[in-house]
Amino acid sequence: MTNKHRYAGIPRWISLPAACAVLFLLVPFIALLIRIDWVQFPHLFSQALSSQALALSLRTCIASTLACIIVGLPLALVCARARDTWWSRVLRSMVTLPMVLPPVVAGLALLITWGRRGLIGAYLQIFGINIAFTTVAVVMAQTFVSLPFFVSSLEGALRTRGFNEERVASGLGASPSRTLWSVTLPLMIPALVSSTALAFSRALGEFGATITFAGSLAGVTRTLPLEIYLQREESTDMALMLSVILVFVALVLVGGASAFSQWWYSRLLSGTSADEAKVPTASRLATEHSRGLGNKDGEAQGQLPRVPVPGVRIAGTLPERHINVDLTCQGGVVTALMGHNGAGKSTLLSVLSGALDAPQMTYTWEWPDGASGRQPKIAILEQKPVLFPHMSLLANVAFPLRCAGISSAEAEVRAREALESVGLAGLEQRRPAQVSGGQAQRTALARALVVAPEVLLLDEPMAALDVEAARGLRELIAQRFLGRTVIMVTHQIEDAAALDAHIIVLKGGRLLREGLWRELINQSISHADESDSALLAMGLSALERALGQE
């Protein structure tokens, strides 16, 4: 790849101010290294005051960083998940306020709060507790100035990553606590390490708040920055030596955090390799089933057992999306929601799954026994399958079973069976990043199988797949979920034909037409008019290919 293509979109003149910025930041450190008397470095470092200040700084910074993690991590999660309301904006403003305050002002605020005559400190004096001008005050000052950096950095990383994995985990039956420990925390490890390094570095360099609130008592509150400031007038060589130590520690932290992030992301791509020859293709898998592979009950291998399943009636309006519908999806059959982009198909699916709050829209699950209202077990397959990237395919499929309280051993056995039933035997230990899009979708399908849902929601799961992978996925859905309620969003007539679907055509957020796919196609071909043009545009050529395969 040539430089011309590598840097496409960046004007050449940008390099000049960028180089100036680098030099502006780098030259002072070079000057610092040149100015130091390296011969005297060991002697200066061995002096009591310097080693004492360094040890105190490291101890207090570790304590303040731990405090940042303990209270800052929950705060970052709250801020990241909060909706954009006035109170969330106020909360973020208060969190970031210490970042823009002069450190001396921060120290003064701490002093009038926790000092002997402070708002809280005066009451602590009654119990003989004195905080100001102690080592505890140093830790509090460092925490006060570094906590906003920790929270802001971590919150930004969380908001950038998004919470799709958490949404899926919740839909698979995970409690909020299990979701936090099994999904959120593992995925935020690189951001947590980077934020921790940033907080530690900020605490290590704190000066103004410390000297105002804690003073400068040797061995008690005199940290490395304070010692550097005092030595600047007494011994320039000592001040320079301590400065280099400070820079070195910060450099190790930043470099270590970056290296750890790279290692962690590379670990996501690691996994036990498998023999590709053992993994059936979609065509081979379909051939096996066409030969009548079955279990002792006569059901296709991996097919879910027959159970009562509900239909659903959804009615109401969603004014902001111009939706006004009253329609019913029958139980035990495949319903295909079709129409142009913006017709409201995915919106209705989001309402049914609970991902979208629509107060003016209601849906009622109608069970065969006449009962209504009971929430069925629902599984969702999306266009881009949301698998947990830090887990193997086996762990992904076993996840909902573990959430249901099933033992680890039994969950693993059932997960292996589900993966084998969708043609992924031999890939159990691979991670999602190591498999193709079609294999990822089949993994999501296997995860849906172990949940044994009564309702399966499909949001264009075949759209991003190649022809063979899409055909294989259709066949798997048709075979495994026979007799279950399947509601599918699609633009392809071929999908509806392969799954023998009842089609509901939406236009502009309203019901345009519905019926069995064969009936609608026959009507569209025989009486084509403007109202049917949307249906015809979805691909009669694709339909002909599907009919040709029957």
Model regions: which residues?
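Helical segment within the ABC ATPase nucleotide-binding domain
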Residues: 470-482
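Conserved ABC ATPase signature
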Residues: 431-435, 439
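Conserved ABC ATPase "signature" region
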Residues: 175, 410-427
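Catalytic Walker B motif of ABC-type/P-loop ATPase nucleotide-binding domains
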Residues: 456-460
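A short, proline-enriched helix->beta-strand linker immediately N-terminal to the Walker B motif
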Residues: 450-454
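Membrane-water interface segments at the C-terminal ends of transmembrane alpha-helices
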Residues: 5-38, 48-159, 183, 187-208, ...
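Conserved beta-strand-loop-alpha-helix hinge in the C-terminal portion
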Residues: 510-541
